[in-house]
Each structure stands twice: as C-alpha cells, then as structure tokens.
C-alpha cells in the first residue's frame, strides 16, 4: 500500500475515510469543475494536472503527483508498475484530456485501486466540452 503523506497546511485534514468521502469528492469535483470552466478544453493533460493540484493544495489538501504503483503477482513478485496521476488524501485521481471517457479508462482506474489497496478514486476528464467526473470505489 502507498504510505500516506502529512498535510503541512494549518487546515483540517480531509482523509478519504468512510465518513468524509462524500465531502472530499464534492470538494475535488467542484475544484475540477471550476478549472474546466476557467481553462476550457484543448490543453494537454499535464496542464490540467498542474492547475488542479495547485488549486487542491491551496484548499489545504495533501496532494501527491505521478505516484508509482507496483503491481505484484500472488506471491508478491513485482510484475509491473503504473503511475497514478494524482493521489489526494488517499483518493486516486485519474485525469484525462480526451473527447470522452471510455470503459478502458474506468478499468485502468479500478486497477489502480486494486493495486494500491485504496478504496476510492475519481476519474476526471477535462477534454470534453461537457465536464465529466466519475466516482469509483471497490
């Protein structure tokens, strides 16, 4: 499992626990939506990642970018590695800048959850004219 990081801000820590997952999702979703309205479509995924992380950090959230996730065989032998776009308060954020979300994007995000042991993720697409955001859980 990926170790948690400390929140260095003097604000209340929002961790992705059963009690506050809805409020954490709402805060992330609203921040991402506001960013989508501000920037619109057409930028590379990295631009949206940088801007979203900046805005979430300003809200006092613990944000980690480009987090390596090891995939192991049943016996623990490492067989591959993913890179998660962003982890906020133990919730994976998988960001896209494509015309629409696909089943493959959902499967990728669910695999990140399986590989990390984390329970919650959000799949956010900035590339569509209509804002797309899906909450996923195991």
Name each region found by the language model.
Residues 1-19:
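Short, low-complexity, charge-dense intrinsically disordered segments
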Residues 21-26, 30, 41-45, 49, ...:
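Nuclease catalytic cores
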Residues 32-38:
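N-terminal capping segment at the start of a domain
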Residues 40, 63, 84-99, 112:
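Conserved catalytic cores of phosphodiester-cleaving nucleases, focusing on short active-site segments
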Residues 57-73:
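A short acidic/basic microdomain associated with nuclease active sites
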Residues 78-82:
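A short, glycine/Asx- and small/polar-enriched loop/turn
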Residues 92, 96-138:
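Nucleic-acid nuclease catalytic cores
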